[in-house]
Design a protein with these regions (language model features):
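Structural/interface elements that position substrates and couple domains in central-metabolism enzymes
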Residues: 2-10, 15-102, 110-177
Length: 177
């Protein structure tokens, strides 16, 4: 199905002569419906201020949420190799994953996105997803040149909630009264 999504997009893109992946709800929904395995780059076990509460990290919150909806999420962090988070063992890099990856979801700074994009191409990922606040024109060029679906500056958890559960993507703690 992900191959179908990618083919559909490229056919449509050639018809209209431009790329507009970042705002396509239909393509994002099809992607989330068909994906089974997500590599989450940048899963952190502890906050920088040395907190021991791993559940408060955005990456671990999103990881747990996706697991609850049936996705296999493989955490990637070169500084925490071998440690466990939400029942999964952290690997050091994308190349360490031995199963096919549908989505590479990135929780790293924008400047690291091109390198992660190159690794995503090498492992044959179908989708390259940059979380809120992360954008990279260079990474976009890398993945799109290989016909990999590119999403940036969107939270995969909030997109799932919005498109499937019709839930407001605003965190309850941030809602005004």
């Amino acid at each position: 199905m992900l191959k179908k999504v990618s083919q559909h997009f490229w056919k449509k893109e050639n018809q209209i002569g431009r790329i507009n992946k970042m705002s396509s709800d239909e393509l994002i929904k099809q992607t989330l419906e068909s994906a089974k395995t997500i590599a989450m780059v940048g899963v952190s076990l502890v906050k920088k201020e040395i907190s021991t509460n791993i559940r408060r990290r955005p990456s671990t919150i999103v990881m747990k949420y996706l697991q609850e909806f049936g996705y296999k999420v493989i955490p990637v962090n070169p500084f925490s190799v071998g440690e466990k988070v939400h029942g999964e063992t952290i690997v050091g890099k994308l190349n360490d994953i031995k199963i096919p990856i549908d989505i590479v979801d990135v929780f790293r700074p924008s400047k690291e996105a091109p390198m992660i994009a190159e690794e995503s191409v090498k492992i044959g990922a179908k989708v390259f997803w940059l979380q809120y606040g992360i954008q990279s024109d260079e990474a976009k060029k890398i993945v799109e040149s290989k016909k990999i679906f590119y999403v940036s500056n969107k939270c995969i958890k909030q997109e799932y909630q919005r498109l499937f559960l019709k839930v407001s993507p605003v965190f309850p703690a941030l809602k005004s009264s």
